[in-house]
Regions:
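Short alpha-beta junction capping motif
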Residues: 65-110
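Histidine-centered active-site/metal-ligand motif
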Residues: 24, 29-31, 104, 127, ...
Length: 245
């Protein structure tokens, strides 16, 4: 029974949608949180995980993170993980017991937690542009993006990030030449802007900056892309820890 219980815990996927102070008002990701919860829960079930929707991270026992699984974060602001929770998350991530799925504004969270940037691969700086733009799929052989064309158009907030971690591998990118020149933003001398990436060392992370609008969560292409990220995290965890998800 104990081994069976542990296996169930290792298959859990926490779906954290804690966005204070952006839970009210005309702007912010709160408009799609219900859609995201539903879609991510369905994808978790399809991929063999037990979804657990969380709007208050203080309710999670840190030992649950140590058991492993996937921590899916659609967050913004100072998500109130306790010191013990942070330690458990970072340790479990580094040991590849816990994979992390970052959605959209998750890079604009936990600014007072230095290890969080290591887990995510970068920190959000600003998003001056909200527009349609062409996206280039950089590595079409990677499982996360197998369903995506080489070049495709999308409408979303265009995030500007701090320098990517050396461990982050870009999956999707766009050119600053595509940005609306009438809107000022931090372009600098960057030739490309990353939109999505993965980390495989020391821990396992898949991140996408896309997903601000309801249309994303109604898009079969977008949902298949997110499913690809979940599949890749699962298989990466399995290969390192022989976890049957």
């Amino acid at each position: 029974m104990a081994a069976e219980t542990l296996a169930i815990q290792k298959r859990r996927m926490w779906i954290v949608t804690q966005v204070a102070p952006y839970s009210h008002g005309p702007a912010g990701v709160h408009r799609v949180l219900a859609q995201a919860n539903t879609a991510l829960s369905e994808l978790a079930l399809i991929e063999g995980f037990d979804p657990c929707c969380v709007s208050d991270v203080t309710t999670i026992n840190p030992s649950e993170f140590e058991a492993g699984g996937i921590l899916a974060l659609f967050t913004i602001g100072e998500t109130p993980f306790s010191t013990v929770q942070r330690t458990a998350i970072f340790s479990s991530w580094r040991s590849s017991n816990l994979g992390v799925l970052g959605i959209h504004s998750a890079t604009d969270a936990c600014h007072n937690w230095p290890d969080y940037a290591t887990i995510m691969g970068a920190r959000f700086i600003e998003h001056p542009w909200t527009q349609s733009f062409p996206i280039e799929t950089v590595n079409r052989e990677h499982p996360c993006v197998l369903n995506l064309p080489k070049i495709w158009n999308w409408q979303d907030e265009l995030y500007v990030f701090s320098a990517l971690s050396k461990n982050a591998h870009i999956l999707l990118q766009t050119s600053p030449n595509n940005f609306d020149p009438q809107i000022a933003g931090t372009v600098g001398d960057r030739e490309v802007f990353p939109l999505s990436w993965y980390i495989a060392d020391p821990g396992i992370t898949f991140y996408t900056s896309l997903g601000h609008f309801p249309e994303a969560w109604e898009s079969t292409q977008y949902l298949q892309y997110i499913r690809g990220g979940i599949q890749w995290i699962r298989e990466s965890l399995n290969s390192r820890n022989s976890i049957s998800a």
